[in-house]
Every structure is written in structure tokens, then in C-alpha cells.
Amino acid sequence: GISGPDLEKALNKAPELYGTKKRYTCGHFPQSFEYSVVGGWVVTRGAGQNSTYYGKIEDLVVCQTYVTPTGIIETKEFPALATGPDIDEIMMGSEGTFGILTRCTLKVFEYRPENIRRFSFIFKNWQDALNATREIMQGQFGYPSVFRLSDPEETEVAMKQYGIEGTIIDKMLKLKGYKPMQKCLLLGTTEGDADFAALAKKKIKKICKKYHGFYTTGFVTKAWEHGRFSDPYMREDLMDFGILIDTLECSVNWEILPNVHKQVREFCKSRPQTVCMTHLSHFYPQKANLYFIFIGKMNKEEYIEYQKGILDAICKSG
């Protein structure tokens, strides 16, 4: 199948390649974007980093064709269904169990990179940051595209990784009482129509200010964009030294999110010399996806037991 970069290149350069009047984007950018293919996105029911605006892959698929041992399953390009079950929904995420995906049609959107508006904020604590993101998602003024909230431990790593540490921004944060291992980073973008992108960013800034968010401009988001697909490459190098890095996620309602975050982190940190970075992405008005990234030295058996413990903590806390 076609890879993510090849698909985006074809869509972005559609006027030159296909004679269209407009440029397009698929809007789907998973962390594996550089080496994954469209078929892989569909059969694993993937989510991209811009999903809060464009939707996940199940929101982008129009129709599909699968080859099975008993025949071909082919859905049509209908805009909606009046009856169920929805065959597209059943097949997406089946990972080859129900058949082999051979063809699919995806939605595309007009590509308007000139309208992208970047923003980032530092909050004094996790709860203020959660309150702000929840209000933004329930504000009914439209959704951001990239939208990512890091907890205190991940924020400390981000301060170094994105070149914030030691800058004038860092010094101002310290003067204003934003403390290490308490402050949280929110970064994101708005896009689409120019008026919408500007209005959405303005609304987001107003809400973040209400919850004591310190505006750190689009500089941090640009730094994140520079390495947004690079983390998977680090995994293999770390494993050569016996250091394992993995990610587990769960979808959590706003009401129970603080408890799930607290309980799972307590388990993760119960293992000595283990880093546990947590962030929220793929936001919805009712909930968000909580990601736990753990890094530590462990063998295969220890990893399996540790992973099971994290899953148990997720289930018990939520």
C-alpha cells in the first residue's frame, strides 16, 4: 500500500500531479507516519496526532474492499447508513482476522498550511491544565487540530527536549512560581478556514488564561513538530542497552481521569529507576485518551509482569 509520506505528497501536490484546482491533505498523522501505510492504519484502527480536528481513521474511511476465504466483502461510497450493523465499522481494526484489506477510499480535506495557528501554555499544576482542556473541548467553538497535554514528569523532559530550559521563557516561569515536577505543558494547533483558526486560538488562549496558563507562543509547538515522528526510532537503540520503552493507553471520562492518572503512575513509579511520562491526546467533549510511556531496564519476563500490572491498575482505577 501507499505510505503516509507518499500519500501526503500526492495530495499536497495534486495540482501539479493531477491537474486539480486545490491542494489536499488526509489529515491522518500517526507517530508511525513515516513508515506506515494506509492499509495498516485501517486494519489497526489507528489514530493520528491531528485526530481531535480531523478524526481517527474510522472517521476518514469512506469504503473498503476485503478478500476473505469465502469471498469478497466490498462496501460502497454512501455518505451515511439508515440501518446497521455498519460493515465498515466491523472490519476496521480487525487486523486481518476477518479478511485482507485490498482497497479503501479515504476522505480528504483542502490543504491550507498558511492558516495553521500554533500555541502552547504552561500551567501551574495538573488539575488546572485538565480543567482548561475540558472547557476547551466543551466550548462548542470548534476543536483544535494537534492538542497534547503533558503531565509534570513528561513536561520536565519536554522542557529539555524542546529547548525551553534556560531560555527567557524558563526564567519567567520560575519568577512566576511555576515549579518543577508540578507544572504542565499544553501545546497544539488550530487550522482550516483562516477565520476559524484565528477564532479558535483566541478562545483557547482566553480559557487557558482563566486557569493560570502562561502563554509560551508557538515556539514550543514548532519544536515538537520537528521531532514528532522520531520517538519510535529511539526504542531500538535503547533496547540494545537493555532499556525498554513502551506505551499503554486508555480512554477515560473527565470525572475519573485524575484518579486513573494518579493510581497508574503510583504503580509505574513503584518500580525503582523507572521513568513514567504521561500525556493526553485524542480529545473529546466527554473524555480524552491517557497515554503512559514507561522507560526502564528490565528483561522480557519482568516486562510482561510490569505491563500486566499497569493494565490491572488502569482497570481498577477506572
Predicted regions located by residue number:
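FAD-binding subdomain of flavoenzyme oxidoreductases
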Residues: 2-148
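C-terminal substrate-recognition/cap domain of FAD-linked oxidoreductases
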Residues: 130-313
